[in-house]
Amino acid sequence: MYKIGKYFLLFTFVFSFTQCARRSTPTGGLKDTLPPEMINASPKMNTIFFDKEKITITFDEFIKLKDTSNQLIISPPLELKQYKIKPQGTVSKKIQIELLDSLVEGTTYTFNFGESIIDNNEGNPLPFFRYAMSTGPIIDSLEIRGKITDAYERITAPYTSIHLYPIDSTFSDSTIFLKKPFYATSTLDSVVYNFKTLPPDPYDIIA
């Protein structure tokens, strides 16, 4: 009788412990709504006398690149055979830009990623992230700021893309339909836009 009672109590304890364990289910945290943040770049942003073959940009979380064929704007433009960008189809905490051809001397280059950089978990974009460097002694410093107003609607929509085309000997009325813009930015959640590190040239601006 004593042995039976002891085993019964032991069984009851184990059963109760198991039931408690089953009822304790973990809950998820708050949804991530923040975009990735750059923590380092090598060479550093706005480097002058650039002579490297690779640029590495490090972020605070894993990122993916999305639609770089349309989103990425390199100014002055580089052909696809002149560079490679990673990651493509995978995730990483780093973006690597490998330069496969020599760059023009004394020129400021800007890599504008549009909204192609997104975090791996929730797909939050890092809007219009730019990396700039110069192969010469200075970084171009012309800055263009402005405000847009919708000509037909009472409220101007946010997140409007603004494009710049240099007005040179090759520019025509059809240029904006046939070529990607040299420079691009966005009003983000406002109606104000801002271009930086531009050479002092005349431009055609399109919203």
Q: Predicted segments — roles?
A:
Residues 1-18:
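Sec-dependent bacterial lipoprotein signal peptides
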Residues 4, 20-206:
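Acidic, low-complexity Ser/Thr/Gly/Pro-rich repeat segments typical of extracellular/periplasmic
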